[in-house]
Amino acid sequence: MTVAATSPHVMPTYGRIPIALERGQGCRVWDTNGKEYLDALAGIAVNTLGHNHPKLVPALQEQLTKLIHTSNYYHVPLQEQLAALLTERAGMTNVFFCSTGLEANEGAIKIARKYGIDKGIAQPQIVVYEHAFHGRSFATMSATANPK
């Protein structure tokens, strides 16, 4: 299969590599011609568990028959159990669950600012990677000098 230009229906937010991926297993992916690649991007760092993991697929399939996602307005017992485990292991008091990296970065910025203000720091400063991608909200885009 020859990879054509990106569909006009897809916003051109990335310069796409001329490869059409079809499937994955662990840290490897295959294109529509059957060529194998090492997935060093992991879905831009959001797919760190790999592709088609034999222990994850059944667990995810089972969860899909129950709840995919629900608002934090409700108690979610498994989420609360995970929070207890994470806080115990990290020595922290609570966790903030997010759906995206943008939410995590935005939340971290807000928490860091609040911490600084609570400590009496007039203008708390936050350390971020320069020219890195932290999300597409105004707060995360203005956290670095990345013009995109």
Give the location of each predicted region:
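N-terminal glycine-rich, Lys/His-bearing helix-loop that initiates the first secondary-structure elements
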Residues: 1-94
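PLP-dependent aspartate aminotransferase-fold enzymes
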Residues: 83-148
